[in-house]
Amino acid sequence: MIRIELNEDEIMGALRHVHRVRQNKKEFNVTDKKFDKNNSSYSVNLMGRLGEVACAKGLGLSVDESINPGGDDGHDLHTSLGKSIQVKTSTIPTLIFNHETNFISDYAILVVLEGDKQLPHVDSAFHIVGITDRKYFFDNFTYHDYGYGQRLILSQDKLHPINEGFNINEISRLFGSAL
């Protein structure tokens, strides 16, 4: 597991990005689906963006700055060899997808927030926990209901761990696919 603390510029960049995303959604009358009854849509969006920034920082990748009315295309990061990654940020050590069709990237990475999910930008750190590919996820996930319907989950112990020195361009060896 890699622990990442974001600096002020990275946090402000994430805040600006989420503000632009929300302005874009308002302009195009796009309503967020709310999947966390104990948190605001804004905080959920911000926590996710901060997790993407932390993951990119920890793995030496660039974040996607594009903004689309319907949200991003599901691909949060890309390896230098063109493989796509979805970053899933949570407060619990479990990779969660709301629906089977939501895992569209080549890989998914779990990032866990250490801090207050309602104020994810204040005194927080992020842990890049583990990675899976689509095949392994769909072969090993279970269902869980957190109070708002069945979700597809994979616990931290079933993910391939990401530790200091992890090289994202070597993931083909982990999952047997060419990058």
Locate each region found by the language model.
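Nucleic-acid endonuclease domains
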Residues: 1-81, 88-179
